[in-house]
């Protein structure tokens, strides 16, 4: 050993001795000297003797968590100090002080330099245990490469060593550590303890430098015996280290080191952290966080030993192996406008609930996610061009661009990839079940495949492991953090890169959320009124405040805590009309959970009677809210009269009673354009009202419904107080499913309408709900309610089949009903995607059963056919997506009778079970919540020519004097009895005008005709006149033309649809632009045909057409 190292320079040895004396003095000054190193008693005798002789430390036992923390952290201090300290800082100090030096990191014989630099020199010349008996020093390279170096001003100075020779010096230092790792580790650990008690801060970084060289030696020394050949031993150690999956942590090493004689292997010792190759990307605690001073942990331990409380420890750093291995398989494709999308969602798991509760119980209230280390392993062949975007997503936000915190795109052609992500998200951390659930499930990982290159669904594409670094804090007041001061500091220690998302080879690109985005511009702030303080009830006898009878110790575990505490009031907020799930806890089920209704928001109320033996299809009430509110004369009505137009958002509250035995299903709809005849009293079904804004509820589990209606969205306009202008405020309440068991007596429903007049008015009189032309994504607007359907108690009816043809009309008895979403869908020949749906059980709770949902290309599929294909087993009110079974790859929209059509089948599995005397059937409703993944749907018309639509035809003309008008709105033309017949044509474009409330725009008319006699005998003319404005006394004329009976071209003229306010509707009285057609020789005309072409058109409000 001495032959290799030579001797230390005299100045260096003296400096180290002075340092040793200074350290001993600092120890004696320390008030908490007794618990400084409780691990001492566990060391071997030689190490104890060395430390006691060198530092005069007392003997004592015990294990302090802070000391174990330091032992574990020493391993993580890898190449940081060796590269940054030995090259950068020491070299900079030498240049600044003009100190003669040997190489980049070795100083000696430098009189006049500061104590900090002396400490540097002393530590970097760290001696072995034999330093007292034999002077040794690093090998001074005196020959060959050093001969031409410039000589220093002192005799002992060997001059400057070129920067490239640092490796030779590091080899010498490595040799020292490899042979004497145990005493050097103990030495630097002891040095690190005294940072707070007088030792220079630079000394800690020197200690970390040596610590970076120790873990591999510790991992191998107790497994391999030295052979005497230094190079052979070093290669053996390296081979052993390379064969291990990961580097042991300090804690695992000590456990194994002291139990090596027992022959037991420490289980799961490799799970402490990922193996870290210094040449690749990787996180360590030291990269992200400052070290917690060991003295702080020792002081905390000593305070606990004395029974005192120390409130200074407000920050805790955790490092969790969130996912050791997760395999991502290619998911099903979702159809989008940009093509198929393959995306897999994975929750980033946290610690167990029990571990989280224990931390919460001791006071940790906030969890800051500071960094996530993701390692990706590809499972496809090298060179296959498949890419995947892996995103860290905030699951509380439904908007993907907003929710994405950072993301990176991986080229799976490279087998191993790694990315460091700094998401910056703080989560509440408490004993509340909601907070624990949010902490464990909020952060998600999304794997989005661009193009799977023909790989089958379900193929394992990649595996990934994740390592998360978090920081726990006790209060929001805590501003202290162990996180590095800036991103640049983190980047230096993490991977010498840049940005919040840093990646290794194989990463194509990365995305990062802006840390300080500009704030959006909002409307002027409207301050709400100050809430009135709540009064406590005082016991008249004792004078004490009466406590709530819901004790704090009561355990309340419920599915959705937000349902309990965020109960919406009439003043604002939006409540889903879907009934709550079985596991949820509604406000009315909690004692004392009352809410206040502001009477100043009440527009009108009415009590609706329900017969005790009510039947399905019965209309209970038709409420003209505008007319009834005028009679009721509420405060809101007076505001309405004063302002003229109603505010856009209204709330309809329906309060009934829960009846779990009756099986009644009630509904309400908003018929703004009176498409349901006023004489209708019975026969109201879901097929009739599903195209109107509506809500449905079953009395078995719902007693109150709050329905928020946005008039701007469903109508595109508001309503005038003193007259019906654009439409009508008609609300219908009806029965969709009658009694299974007759009620004891007639009962009633309380219906009220509320308007918050502090809300903003509509920005314009008319806001279009649909703009021509239709787009492929508009087919996803399909939202309907079907049913009720049933399974009989005797099992004779155990299956219900539903054809999914979104472009066809709905059958309603002997009538057909056309709705706005279905007419829009009819503009496309086919569609692709999935159906979002749910099933709502509505029968008496005495009847129970289970069912599955399957798909088929025909309605004859039985249970054996369903279970062999993809199918779903669902519960009531759960929303799920159905991927249809289609042999052609596309689903027909409005035809398919010859080649088949897709069906959704609901088949009974178990049940139906009920008491002996049960009556009725097991009933359910089907809710369609829209279509997803719709893309590239071919239209009915070719894209390279104008779109013309047939409107009507006039024939059988019996009078030579023909006069008829074409109005400036698309509607059915009525024949003139005894003069001519009219045929109105049906097509998706003309139907679009009939299923919307108002329309306004420009159309181009194409008018053609033909004679009914031979060409030589035909005579006469046909002419038109455009009336821009017309009254009995005044006319504004537009274009005009006269043509002969024999004419091949006909007329083409543009005409505006809309009254003076910019829109019109079918059958609306008033003056609109029109076109007059005249002929004095009309009997010579066989027929006149009129088609139209939409140039531009806005549609307002969706409704239905019943024929």
From Swiss-Prot:
Its main location: host cell. Specific enzymatic cleavages in vivo by the P1 encoded 3C-like protease yield mature proteins. One of its GO terms (biological process) is transport of virus in host, cell to cell. Residues 572-581 have a biased composition (Polar residues). Residues 553-584 are annotated as: Disordered. It is found in: Host cell junction, Host plasmodesma. Keywords: Capsid protein, Host cell junction, Host cytoplasm, Host nucleus, Transport, Viral movement protein, Virion. One of its GO terms (molecular function) is structural molecule activity. GO terms for cellular component: host cell cytoplasm; host cell nucleus; host cell plasmodesma; viral capsid. InterPro entries: Nepo_coat (IPR005054), Nepo_coat_C (IPR005305), Nepo_coat_N (IPR005306), Viral_coat (IPR029053). It comes from the Viruses. Transmembrane segments: none annotated. The keyword rRNA-binding does not apply. Belongs to the nepoviruses RNA2 polyprotein family. Virions are comprised of 60 copies of the coat protein. This is RNA2 polyprotein.
């Amino acid at each position: 050993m001495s032959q290799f190292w030579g001797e230390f320079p005299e100045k260096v040895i003296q400096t180290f001795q002075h340092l040793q004396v200074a350290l001993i003095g600092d120890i004696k000054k320390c008030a908490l000297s007794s618990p400084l190193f409780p691990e001492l008693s566990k060391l071997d005798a030689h190490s104890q003797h060395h430390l006691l002789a060198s530092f005069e430390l007392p003997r004592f036992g015990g294990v302090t968590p802070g000391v174990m923390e330091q032992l574990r952290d020493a391993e993580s201090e890898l190449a940081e100090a060796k590269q940054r300290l030995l090259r950068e800082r020491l070299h900079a100090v030498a240049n600044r002080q003009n100190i003669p030096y040997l190489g980049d990191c070795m100083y000696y014989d430098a009189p006049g330099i500061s104590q900090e630099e002396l400490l540097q020199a002393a530590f970097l010349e760290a001696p072995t245990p034999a330093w007292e008996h034999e002077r040794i020093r690093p090998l001074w390279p005196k020959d060959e490469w050093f001969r031409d170096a410039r000589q220093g001003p002192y005799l002992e100075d060997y001059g400057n060593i070129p920067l490239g020779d640092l490796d030779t010096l590091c080899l010498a230092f490595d040799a020292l550590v490899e042979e004497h790792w145990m005493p050097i580790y103990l030495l630097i650990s002891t040095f690190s303890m005294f940072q707070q008690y007088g030792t220079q801060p630079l000394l800690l970084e020197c200690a970390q430098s040596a610590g970076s060289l120790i873990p591999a030696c510790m991992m191998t020394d107790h497994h391999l015996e030295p052979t005497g050949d230094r190079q052979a031993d070093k290669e053996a150690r390296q081979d052993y280290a390379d064969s291990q999956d990961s580097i042991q942590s300090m804690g695992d090493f000590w456990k194994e080191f002291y139990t090596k004689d027992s022959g037991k292997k420490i289980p799961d010792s490799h799970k402490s952290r990922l193996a870290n190759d210094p040449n690749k990307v990787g996180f360590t605690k030291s990269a992200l966080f400052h070290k917690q001073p060991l003295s702080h942990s020792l002081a905390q331990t000593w305070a606990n030993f004395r029974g005192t409380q120390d409130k200074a420890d407000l920050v805790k750093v955790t490092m969790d192996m969130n996912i050791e291995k997760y395999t991502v398989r290619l998911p099903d494709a979702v159809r989008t406008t940009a093509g198929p999308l393959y995306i897999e969602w994975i929750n980033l798991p946290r610690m167990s609930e029990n571990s989280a509760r224990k931390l919460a119980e001791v006071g940790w209230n906030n969890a800051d996610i500071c960094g996530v280390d993701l390692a990706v392993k590809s499972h496809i062949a090298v060179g296959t061009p498949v890419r995947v975007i892996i995103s860290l997503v905030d699951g509380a936000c439904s908007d993907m661009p907003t929710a994405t915190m950072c993301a990176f795109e991986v080229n799976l052609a490279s087998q191993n990839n790694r990315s460091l992500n700094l998401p910056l998200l703080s989560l509440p951390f408490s004993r509340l079940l909601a907070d624990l659930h949010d902490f464990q499930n909020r952060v998600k990982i999304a794997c989005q495949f661009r193009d799977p290159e023909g790989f089958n669904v379900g193929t394992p594409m990649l595996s990934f492991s994740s390592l998360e670094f978090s920081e726990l804090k006790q209060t929001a007041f805590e501003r202290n953090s162990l996180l590095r001061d800036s991103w640049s500091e983190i980047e230096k220690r993490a991977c010498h890169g840049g940005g919040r998302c840093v990646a290794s080879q194989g990463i194509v690109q990365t995305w990062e959320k802006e840390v300080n985005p500009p704030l959006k511009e909002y409307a002027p702030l409207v301050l709400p009124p100050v809430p009135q303080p709540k009064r406590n009830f005082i016991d008249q006898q004792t004078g004490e405040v009466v406590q709530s009878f819901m004790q704090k110790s009561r355990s309340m575990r419920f599915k959705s805590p937000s349902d309990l505490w965020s109960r919406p009031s009439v003043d604002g907020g939006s409540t889903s009309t879907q009934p709550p799930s079985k596991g949820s806890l509604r406000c009315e089920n909690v004692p004392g959970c009352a809410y206040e209704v502001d009477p100043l928001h009440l527009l009108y109320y009415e009590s609706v009677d329900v017969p005790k033996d009510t039947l399905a299809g019965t209309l209970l009430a038709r409420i003209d809210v505008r007319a009834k509110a005028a009679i009721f004369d509420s405060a809101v009505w007076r505001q309405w009269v004063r302002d003229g137009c109603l505010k856009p958002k209204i709330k309809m509250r329906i309060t009934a009673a829960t009846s779990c035995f009756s099986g009644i299903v009630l509904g309400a709809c908003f018929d703004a354009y009176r498409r349901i005849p006023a004489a209708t009293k019975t026969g109201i079904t879901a097929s009739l009202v599903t195209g109107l804004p509506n809500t449905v509820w079953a009395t078995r589990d719902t007693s109150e419904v709050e329905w928020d209606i946005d008039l701007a969205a469903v109508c595109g306009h508001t309503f005038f107080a003193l007259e019906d202008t654009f439409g009508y405020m008609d609300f219908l309440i009806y029965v969709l499913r009658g009694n299974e068991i007759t009620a004891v007596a007639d009962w009633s429903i309380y219906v009220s309408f509320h308007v918050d007049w502090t809300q903003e008015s509509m920005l314009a009189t008319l806001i279009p709900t649909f703009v021509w032309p239709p787009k492929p994504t508009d087919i996803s607007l399909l939202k309907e309610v079907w049913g009720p359907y049933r399974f009989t108690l005797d099992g004779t009816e155990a299956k219900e089949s539903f054809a999914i043809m979104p472009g066809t009309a709905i059958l309603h008895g002997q009538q057909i009903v056309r709705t706005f979403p279905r007419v829009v869908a009819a503009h496309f020949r086919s569609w692709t995607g999935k159906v979002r749906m749910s099933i709502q059980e509505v029968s008496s709770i005495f009847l129970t059963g289970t069912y599955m949902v399957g798909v088929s290309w025909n309605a004859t599929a039985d249970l054996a056919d369903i279970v062999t294909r993809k199918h779903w087993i669902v519960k009531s009110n759960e929303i799920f997506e159905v991927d249809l079974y289609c042999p052609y790859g596309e689903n027909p929209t409005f035809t398919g009778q010859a080649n088949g059509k897709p069906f959704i089948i609901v088949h009974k599995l178990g049940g139906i079970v009920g008491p002996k005397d049960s009556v009725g059937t097991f009933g359910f409703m089907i809710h369609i919540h829209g279509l997803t993944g719709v893309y590239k749907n071919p239209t009915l018309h070719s894209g390279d020519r104008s779109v013309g639509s047939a409107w009507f035809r006039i024939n059988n003309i019996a009078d030579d004097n023909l006069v008829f008008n074409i109005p400036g709105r698309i509607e059915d033309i009525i024949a003139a009895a005894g003069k001519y017949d009219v045929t109105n044509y049906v097509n998706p474009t003309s139907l679009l005008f009939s299923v919307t409330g108002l329309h306004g725009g420009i159309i181009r008319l194409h008018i053609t005709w033909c004679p009914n006699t031979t060409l030589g005998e035909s005579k006469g003319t046909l002419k038109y006149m455009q009336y821009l404005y017309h009254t009995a006394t005044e006319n504004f004329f537009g274009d005009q033309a006269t043509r002969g009976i024999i004419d091949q071209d006909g007329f083409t003229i543009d005409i505006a649809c809309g009254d003076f306010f910019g829109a019109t509707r079918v059958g609306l009285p008033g003056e609109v632009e029109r076109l007059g057609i005249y002929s004095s020789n009309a009997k010579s005309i066989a027929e006149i045909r009129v088609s139209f072409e939409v140039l531009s058109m806005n549609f307002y409000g969706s409704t239905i057409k019943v024929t």
